[in-house]
């Protein structure tokens, strides 16, 4: 593992614990020996207030490569979401998560979460990742909103 990646992730964790957006969760996983694994985080993003996603808490895994922050983390909803910019595998399709597009090493975990939360409510129809969600979003917005309201209810924290 890269010392640069681990150092940056330790800084990110410290900053996150000190100050993060209300309702968001980001916790490094544990290795089998009980030590913290900074390369694999279990996260959750709340649905934005005043949107059909409100009330939902959407679980996301962030996986960091050894060359982080030169390369972005992989962000994957678990379980996958019905959304035009979420691949059927759960992987998020967002330009700031793509090395050859808008990723910059200065982007923080906090900024990634805000970007993903915005994407939930405002899909980018220029970059669809899921055909069914994209088609319904474009052709029948009422049905689309009904489906993701149901999804938000399904992912309500207990």
UniProtKB/Swiss-Prot annotation:
<keyword id="KW-0067">ATP-binding</keyword>
<dbReference type="GO" id="GO:0005634">
    <property type="term" value="C:nucleus"/>
</dbReference>
<dbReference type="InterPro" id="IPR016135">
    <property type="entry name" value="UBQ-conjugating_enzyme/RWD"/>
</dbReference>
<dbReference type="GO" id="GO:0007059">
    <property type="term" value="P:chromosome segregation"/>
</dbReference>
<feature type="cross-link" description="Glycyl lysine isopeptide (Lys-Gly) (interchain with G-Cter in SUMO2)">
    <location>
        <position position="48"/>
    </location>
</feature>
<keyword id="KW-0833">Ubl conjugation pathway</keyword>
<keyword id="KW-0159">Chromosome partition</keyword>
<dbReference type="GO" id="GO:0033235">
    <property type="term" value="P:positive regulation of protein sumoylation"/>
</dbReference>
<comment type="function">
    <text>Accepts the ubiquitin-like proteins SUMO1, SUMO2 and SUMO3 from the UBLE1A-UBLE1B E1 complex and catalyzes their covalent attachment to other proteins with the help of an E3 ligase such as RANBP2, CBX4 and ZNF451. Can catalyze the formation of poly-SUMO chains. Essential for nuclear architecture and chromosome segregation. Necessary for sumoylation of FOXL2 and KAT5. Sumoylates p53/TP53 at 'Lys-386'. Mediates sumoylation of ERCC6 which is essential for its transcription-coupled nucleotide excision repair activity.</text>
</comment>
<feature type="cross-link" description="Glycyl lysine isopeptide (Lys-Gly) (interchain with G-Cter in SUMO2); alternate">
    <location>
        <position position="49"/>
    </location>
</feature>
<keyword id="KW-0832">Ubl conjugation</keyword>
<feature type="cross-link" description="Glycyl lysine isopeptide (Lys-Gly) (interchain with G-Cter in ubiquitin); alternate">
    <location>
        <position position="18"/>
    </location>
</feature>
<dbReference type="Pfam" id="PF00179">
    <property type="entry name" value="UQ_con"/>
</dbReference>
<dbReference type="InterPro" id="IPR050113">
    <property type="entry name" value="Ub_conjugating_enzyme"/>
</dbReference>
<keyword id="KW-0007">Acetylation</keyword>
<dbReference type="InterPro" id="IPR000608">
    <property type="entry name" value="UBQ-conjugat_E2_core"/>
</dbReference>
<comment type="similarity">
    <text>Belongs to the ubiquitin-conjugating enzyme family.</text>
</comment>
<keyword id="KW-0498">Mitosis</keyword>
<keyword id="KW-0808">Transferase</keyword>
<feature type="site" description="Interaction with RANBP2">
    <location>
        <position position="4"/>
    </location>
</feature>
<feature type="domain" description="UBC core">
    <location>
        <begin position="4"/>
        <end position="157"/>
    </location>
</feature>
<feature type="modified residue" description="N-acetylserine">
    <location>
        <position position="2"/>
    </location>
</feature>
<keyword id="KW-0132">Cell division</keyword>
<feature type="modified residue" description="N6-acetyllysine">
    <location>
        <position position="65"/>
    </location>
</feature>
<feature type="site" description="Interaction with RANBP2">
    <location>
        <position position="57"/>
    </location>
</feature>
<dbReference type="GO" id="GO:0016740">
    <property type="term" value="F:transferase activity"/>
</dbReference>
<feature type="cross-link" description="Glycyl lysine isopeptide (Lys-Gly) (interchain with G-Cter in SUMO2)">
    <location>
        <position position="101"/>
    </location>
</feature>
<feature type="cross-link" description="Glycyl lysine isopeptide (Lys-Gly) (interchain with G-Cter in SUMO1); alternate">
    <location>
        <position position="49"/>
    </location>
</feature>
<protein>
    <recommendedName>
        <fullName>SUMO-conjugating enzyme UBC9</fullName>
        <ecNumber>2.3.2.-</ecNumber>
    </recommendedName>
</protein>
<feature type="region of interest" description="Interaction with SUMO1">
    <location>
        <begin position="13"/>
        <end position="18"/>
    </location>
</feature>
<feature type="cross-link" description="Glycyl lysine isopeptide (Lys-Gly) (interchain with G-Cter in SUMO2); alternate">
    <location>
        <position position="18"/>
    </location>
</feature>
<dbReference type="GO" id="GO:0005524">
    <property type="term" value="F:ATP binding"/>
</dbReference>
<keyword id="KW-0547">Nucleotide-binding</keyword>
<dbReference type="GO" id="GO:0051301">
    <property type="term" value="P:cell division"/>
</dbReference>
<feature type="site" description="Interaction with RANBP2">
    <location>
        <position position="25"/>
    </location>
</feature>
<keyword id="KW-1017">Isopeptide bond</keyword>
<comment type="subunit">
    <text>Forms a complex with SENP6 and UBE2I in response to UV irradiation. Forms a tight complex with RANGAP1 and RANBP2. Identified in a complex with SUMO2 and UBE2I, where one ZNF451 interacts with one UBE2I and two SUMO2 chains, one bound to the UBE2I active site and the other to another region of the same UBE2I molecule. Interacts with SETX. Interacts with HIPK1 and HIPK2. Interacts with PPM1J. Interacts with RASD2. Interacts with TCF3. Interacts with NR2C1; the interaction promotes its sumoylation. Interacts with SIAH1. Interacts with PARP.</text>
</comment>
<feature type="site" description="Substrate binding">
    <location>
        <begin position="100"/>
        <end position="101"/>
    </location>
</feature>
<dbReference type="InterPro" id="IPR023313">
    <property type="entry name" value="UBQ-conjugating_AS"/>
</dbReference>
<dbReference type="GO" id="GO:0005737">
    <property type="term" value="C:cytoplasm"/>
</dbReference>
<feature type="active site" description="Glycyl thioester intermediate">
    <location>
        <position position="93"/>
    </location>
</feature>
<keyword id="KW-0963">Cytoplasm</keyword>
């Amino acid at each position: 593992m890269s010392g640069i990646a681990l150092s940056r992730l330790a800084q990110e964790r410290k900053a996150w614990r000190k100050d993060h957006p209300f309702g968001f969760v980001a916790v490094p996983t544990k290795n089998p020996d009980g030590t913290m694994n900074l390369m694999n985080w279990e996260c959750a993003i709340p649905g934005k207030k005043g949107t059909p996603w409100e009330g939902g808490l959407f679980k996301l895994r962030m996986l960091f490569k050894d060359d982080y922050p030169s390369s972005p983390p992989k962000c994957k909803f678990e379980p996958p979401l019905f959304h035009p910019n979420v691949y059927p595998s759960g992987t998020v399709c967002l330009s700031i998560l793509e090395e050859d597009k808008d990723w910059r090493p200065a982007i923080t975990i906090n900024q990634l979460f805000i970007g993903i939360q915005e994407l939930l409510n405002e899909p980018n129809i220029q970059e669809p990742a899921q055909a069914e969600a994209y088609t319904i979003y474009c052709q029948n917005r009422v049905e689309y909103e009904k489906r993701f309201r149901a999804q938000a209810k399904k992912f309500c924290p207990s």
